[in-house]
Amino acid sequence: MIKLKIKYGNSQTDIRFPCTEKEMNAALERIHAEDVTPLELYVSEVIFPEELGCLQDRFVNLDEVNFLGKRMDSFFGDEEYQFYEAMKLEGFDTLPDLINLSFNLNRYPLIQDIGDMGKIGREYLLTVNGCIPAHDEDDPKYAQLGRELIQSGNGIFTEHGM
């Protein structure tokens, strides 16, 4: 969920995304912006999540924010952390970039438990390929891949993992 304080003229209101068209229209009516086209309004504050602070103090397209909110609501497991870490890594700060990133999280594996080399290899392949065979979970090739990934130096340690 995304919650922003939007401003139009001297009026402000909070709006949560994703939202229905009815909820969007009600919020726009509260600030007398129902006739604004294109639907770009000023964000005076990003209430939640703080990681989207890049949207604050700028004009944004509310339809794009709503679409991003829908994408973020569909995140599963650690995908939200993946999204925030990839966003920071790449320096993405525009809505089109953030929406695009939400469709490409498989390019940014996030491994939270780096104590087990086999688990690192399995999680990496699962993120990048989308699946791994269930019958060879204990195969040493995953531990070897995990060691190679750690030794490559390409991994970046973050507050949510590597």
Residue ranges and their predicted role:
Residues 1-26:
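Short, extreme N-terminal segment that most often corresponds to the first beta-strand
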Residues 5-10, 35, 46-48, 160:
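Short, flexible beta-strand-to-coil junctions
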Residues 16, 26-29, 55, 136-137, ...:
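Generic alpha-helix signal with a bias toward terminal, lower-confidence helices
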Residues 21-23, 49, 151:
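A generic structural micro-environment signature
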Residues 21-24, 118, 142-143:
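Alpha-helix initiation and N-capping motif
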Residues 28-131, 138:
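Mixed-charge (acidic/basic) macromolecular-recognition segments
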Residues 122-162:
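Acidic, proline/glycine-rich low-complexity IDRs
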